[in-house]
Amino acid sequence: MTPAQVIPALAGREHDADGRLVALDYDSTPPLPAPDANPWLVAVDSSDNGLRAVAYAAAQAAAMNACALHLVHVQPWLSKEAAEADLAHRALGASARARATLDAAGLPWRLHVAMGDPATRIIERAVQLRATGIVIGSRGLNVVESLLFGSVAYKVMHLSPMPVMVVP
C-alpha cells in the first residue's frame, strides 16, 4: 500500500455556522501522546520544499526526543458539497509523503486540515496548539515573484507570535 492510500485515523471534524466542513484532524498510528510535549507545527503541501521542511522537523524531533509534530495542510475555500467530497482526499494526497517520512522515522504526528488563507490558518492553529514554533518550506521565490504572488512563508514569519524556521 502506498502512503497516499493509507488513511490515518480521523480524530476530529469542524463545521462552520452554515454546516460546511472546514477542518479535519487525523492521527498517526500510534497517535501523539497526550499532553503534547514541546509541540511544533509543520506546514505541509505536496511540494519538495514542504517535504524538506518535514524532514528537517523530523530530524529535530528525533534529536530532542520529546517533540510533538503537528502537520498542517491548508486548502483554498471549497463549497459545502466540495468540502464534504474532496477536502479529506485532497489533504491526504498532498500530505502523503510528509506522513510517510514521519512514519518511516517512527515519529507520531497529528495532521490538521483546514480551508482558508494558508498563512492565517497556519498561525491560528499554531496559537491554538501553543506551539513552540513553526517549520515551513520556502518556495524559493525571488523578490519580484514574492511581491507579485505573495509568500506564505514570508507572511507567517512576519505575523507569527512564535519562532518560525523557514527551510529552503
Region locations from a protein language model:
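General small-molecule cofactor/ligand-binding pocket signal
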Residues: 70-72, 110-114, 165
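Short secondary-structure boundary segments
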Residues: 73, 138-139, 168
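Short, surface-exposed alpha-helical segments at coil->helix boundaries
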Residues: 84-96
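Structural beta-alpha unit
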Residues: 1-35, 103-134
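Glycine-rich, Arg-bearing micro-motifs that act as flexible, cationic patches
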Residues: 136-158
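Small/aliphatic-rich secondary-structure junction motif
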Residues: 30-85
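Short, flexible loop segments at boundaries between secondary-structure elements
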Residues: 162-168
